[in-house]
From Swiss-Prot:
One of its GO terms (cellular component) is cytoplasm. It comes from Lactococcus lactis subsp. cremoris (strain SK11). Keywords: Oxidoreductase. This is Peptide methionine sulfoxide reductase MsrB. Belongs to the MsrB Met sulfoxide reductase family. Its EC number is 1.8.4.12. It comes from the Bacteria. Gene3D superfamilies: Peptide methionine sulfoxide reductase. InterPro entries: Met_Sox_Rdtase_MsrB, Met_Sox_Rdtase_MsrB_dom, Mss4-like_sf. Residues 3-126 form the MsrB domain. The active site is at residue 115. It catalyses: L-methionyl-[protein] + [thioredoxin]-disulfide + H2O = L-methionyl-(R)-S-oxide-[protein] + [thioredoxin]-dithiol. One of its GO terms (biological process) is protein repair.
Length: 142
């Protein structure tokens, strides 16, 4: 999708986050304190990224997940911006900036914390997976 089409499709915040590597404000975003059962997909492409089963309250101010639904759905990139070194997380197909992954997550779940911008995500409630075209992902909740 071309940049001009994306600007029309996305909110200004979602565009800034996904296309310009922006970061939304902590603690005031849509999914930080949101724990309904369902699937989180890339707001640009709709590619499945995370499930609510892997979401946890990290206290960082952004949605946190212990792992992506499939490692192939995200790609990691070294990020040296803001005078620090981090690992950026991007969606594989649309190349949307999602957030960063850190090694301070729950040890019993692998030790990773995927700190993801709400503005980069669209939530599909569990009871709408089939009607929204994500029926293949119901099995993850069994």
């Amino acid at each position: 999708m071309k940049k001009e089409e994306l600007k029309k499709k996305l909110s200004p915040l979602a565009y800034r986050v996904t296309q310009e590597n922006g970061t939304e404000a902590p603690f005031t975003n849509e999914f930080d304190d949101f724990f309904e059962k369902g699937l989180y997909v890339d707001i640009v492409s709709g590619e499945p990224l995370f499930t609510s089963l892997d979401k946890y309250q990290s206290g960082c101010g952004w949605p946190a997940f212990t792992q992506p639904i499939d490692k192939k759905m995200v790609k990691e990139k070294r990020d040296k911006s803001l005078f620090m070194e981090r690992t950026e997380v991007r969606s594989s197909n649309a190349d949307s900036h999602l957030g960063h992954v850190f090694t301070d997550g729950p040890l019993d779940k692998g030790g990773l914390r995927y700190c993801i911008n709400s503005a980069a995500l669209r939530f599909i409630p569990f009871d709408q997976l089939e009607s929204e075209g994500y029926g293949d992902y119901i099995k993850y909740f069994s």
